[in-house]
Structure formats: structure tokens, C-alpha cells
């Protein structure tokens, strides 16, 4: 039994790729057709890659491995953070700072600085500082929290990274490749499959698609530790009305493609 059904993929719009003018020729093997200037991803191949990728994630999770979640595009940020927090995994949802992996020792010094500032603000010692300095330190703390707060508990390099949109997160992918860290990615038609170890070919722009794949990755990690979630994080929220409206136009195409892809 597959981790995700064809029906789920279709309903989430996972099959909708980019415009035909925005593509990577290396991705051709995962393309089913072209409709009205949009590439349609072959969901039969997506299902096969889901099984391969999720088998790896399940095995890694059962061995206690650490997966770094990466998703800095607007529509992925909240989903990626919630799933990472739910599973107790590190995450990056703001700008990827160069050297997060390849210069991890230096990155740890920034995390140490964040912890130092947290201690200062959580005690009454901050009140001993002049007002101008308090404002400056608060700004520094906020900036560090935004950029490295999600990896503050990552005491070593991750065993793998899970990326939403590897084309946007090119620096993260390059650093992982350089260090031999496996890359798992939800990758659209503009992606280069050659730099991804475990690819899930699919729509990396639509919220429903991102949520389906990322939430299922989270489920695998939770299941691997006996169904225990990180109590510090809430469930994945439903997408906003605006997001639903933006995707309503895809529903008719989904219905038309259900039979053709389901039988292919």
C-alpha cells in the first residue's frame, strides 16, 4: 500500500507543474503532458518516488536520524515550521544563511549568542542596561531568532534535509551535496533531479500540495517514535480563504485528469 493515494495527489493539485517556458529539461522524465501552457506531472511516477523517498525517511526516522526541514518561500513557511516543530526536527523558514551546513561551527556561535541573549532577557539583568542598549539587544535577538531559531537544538549536522522547492533553496541543496548529506525534495518541473537524492516530483507552489507531502513526512517521523508529537507545536492549520480561492481554478482540470492519470 502506498503512503499517499492517487486521489490525494490529484485533489491536492500535485500534478500541476510550471508554465512550459519555465522548466528544466532534466525533469522531462517526470512529465505526463502539457495542457494550456502548463506542464502536467506524471503522478504514476510521483507515487513510485513517494514510496522510494518515504521508505528512506521511515528507515532514517526509526534509526533516530535528524532531518532538517527547509522551506523559505511564503506559502511553505508556516507548513514547514509546524511540521518540523510537531516532530521535534530543526527547520529553516527564513533566508538560508550561507554556511549553515558547510560552516556549521561558525553557525553554532550564532546559536550560542542567541542562547546568551535569551538568558539575559529571561533574567532581570537586562533591566540594568541603558534603554538604547536594551533596544539594540532586543533587535539582535529577534534577528537571530528569525534566522537560526529553528536550528538552535541542532547540535550536529543533520542526517538528511527535506526541501520544498530545491530550485529556490539552491544554496541549501549545494551545501548538502558538498557534504554528502542526502537531499529529499518536493520538486517542480523547473528542478534539476540530478542534485536530489530522493525526489518527490510535484507542485511545490500550491499550499495543498506542499501540505500533503510535508504533513505526510511529519507523520512518518511521528510514527517512528511511537506516535508521540512535540507538544510545543499545534496541528497544521487549514489554508486561508485567499489560498483556497487561488487554487479553485485547478479543480476542473483535476477532475478531467483523474481518469487519464489514474489509468495510465
UniProtKB/Swiss-Prot annotation:
Keywords: Ribonucleoprotein, Ribosomal protein. InterPro entries: Ribosomal_uS2, Ribosomal_uS2_bac/mit/plastid, Ribosomal_uS2_CS, Ribosomal_uS2_flav_dom_sf. Belongs to the universal ribosomal protein uS2 family. Pfam families: Ribosomal_S2 (PF00318). GO terms for biological process: translation. Residues 251-264 have a biased composition (Polar residues). Residues 228-264 are annotated as: Disordered. GO terms for molecular function: structural constituent of ribosome. The keyword ATP-binding does not apply. This is Small ribosomal subunit protein uS2. One of its GO terms (cellular component) is cytosolic small ribosomal subunit. PANTHER family: 30S RIBOSOMAL PROTEIN S2 PROKARYOTIC AND ORGANELLAR, SMALL RIBOSOMAL SUBUNIT PROTEIN US2M. It comes from Deinococcus radiodurans (strain ATCC 13939 / DSM 20539 / JCM 16871 / CCUG 27074 / LMG 4051 / NBRC 15346 / NCIMB 9279 / VKM B-1422 / R1).
